[in-house]
Amino acid sequence: MAKTKSKTPKGKSPAGKTAASRAKAPATAPGIDIGISASDRKQIAAGLASFLSDSFTLYLRTHNFHWNVTGPMFNTLHTMFEGQYTEQWTALDEIAERIRALGFAAPASYADFARLSSIQDGPAVDGGDWRAMVQQLVSGNEAVCRTAREVLEIADDADDAPTEDLLTQRLQTHEKYAWLVRALLACAPPGCIARQGQASGGRHYTGDVPL
């Protein structure tokens, strides 16, 4: 992946420090030599653990809203949320496997995810309050993007191209998700018309757009 900026001295990135400080990577397996120092692998794995926790929390919230949304926007949102949580579920595996490739255990309990995630539980949302659901997903996707950028700084400093590629792909995806759901907040029935749109992951959904 082409570098577009100068290196930040290791351990000096103010952005990277935030994500890495939320997680302490567990003991590494012995004998790993993939061209990245043990200390760098530990810091990257810790950052990815936080990123995985953010991603899982957002996945669970998106799935929750897919199940429970009601009202005039049901068809649009039920289908959109399904496309997003399905894609997110697959991505969780990729993130966890990258942590394992670096030689560390991936967080895998609700307690771990709650401790490491920057996304806090929002207030309970009534199924008919679709705007509150959408606003929580805007905030959640933006939080995932911020954590991805923090860990990307750490991976860039260590020349960890696979982690950089993974995080770049996730950034593109979650920035798009944030845009898609944010756009819905500018539109509310009856001042909308339905048209066919394209959701992420190749799924089609009926999107509402302003007249």
Describe each PLM feature range.
Residues 2-211:
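Iron-associated oxidoreductase/ferritin-like identity signal
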